[in-house]
Amino acid sequence: MKIIGINGSPRKKSNTRFLLEKALGECGKSGAKTKIYDAMKVLDDQEVPFCEHCSSPCNSSCYEGKKLEKMFEELKQSDAIILASPVYFGTVSAQLKAIWDMSRAVRTEHALVGKIGAAISVGASTYGGQETTIRALHDMLLVQGMTIVGNGLKGIDVGHHGVAAREEVFEYEPAIEDAKNIGKRVLDSVCHS
């Protein structure tokens, strides 16, 4: 079982990455192989770090032999994907959006259809756009044909759309628990799909 996380935060010590690590840590406890891709690093060898819609259908030549191609290959082989983004003006980071925009060839192949997807979002304040960002993350997953799960767990809490936290999360137990719960939910959904 393989579960991939994509960290959309451009920051080095990122609240978003921290919660993604917590979620994937829960998956790893049960033996799942996990990996995090940082959007900034994935895009750093791209000549043009966004989709120019240079071909239709997408021939993926813009990322051939690049880090993005490797990441897309791993996504295709994964059982689940957790997208995580900080809030930027009520939506996902430009880096994460750029990566997903360049996934047109993956979509054409139907490579992610039926895979489990989940979302994590961190904003600067309690009502800082986390839910609209999660909605955007869900839309990104749905356009690929993925099955979305929230952070609810049987017998604990029915949960919500995903993990919606505010900075600083490093010692904020409710956010950490939500992240762990979404990891458990992703794992449970993969095992029972």
Where would I find each of the regions flagged by the language model?
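N-terminal beta1-alpha1-beta2 submodule of the flavodoxin-like/Rossmannoid cofactor-binding fold
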Residues: 1-109, 154-193
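Short, glycine-/small-residue-rich phosphate/pyrophosphate-handling segment
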Residues: 94, 108-157
